[in-house]
Regions:
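Conserved beta-strand hairpin/beta-sheet module of binuclear metal-dependent hydrolase folds
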Residues: 1-49
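Active-site HxH/HxHxD metal-binding segment of metal-dependent hydrolases
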Residues: 12, 33-109
């Protein structure tokens, strides 16, 4: 399993890159737009394909990299069902499962 925690000092935001490593699929949680190239380089170096990007909430502390990552990788954009954003591909409910390969995350609102 691959679990990378990255910290953006400017916005004090933690971002996570997660993959089982088996089929080389990955997801990113709470990306910061200024770090998009860094995330893409990590994915490339680890030979991972970004399939999902998740924002856990609307970010007042930074501009999300969700849409930029979608533009560059065609990954699926995920947020909670109460998000007012109209550029989300999947809106998840409380206690819903988000899966990539054999990794399963449970949403909490």
């Amino acid at each position: 399993m691959i679990f990378n925690q990255l910290f953006d000092e400017k916005s004090h935001t933690y971002t996570y890159i997660i993959s089982s490593g088996k089929g080389r699929e990955a997801l990113i949680i709470d990306p910061v737009i200024e770090k998009t190239n860094e995330y893409l380089n990590i994915l490339k170096n680890l030979e991972l394909k970004l399939v999902k990007v998740i924002d856990t909430h609307i970010h007042a502390d930074h501009v999300t990299g969700l849409n930029e990552l979608n533009k560059q990788t065609n990954c699926t954009r995920v947020m909670g069902e109460t998000s007012p954003s109209e550029v989300i591909d999947i809106k998840v409910k409380d206690n819903e499962k988000i899966k990539i390969e054999d990794i399963e995350l449970t949403t909490i609102h």
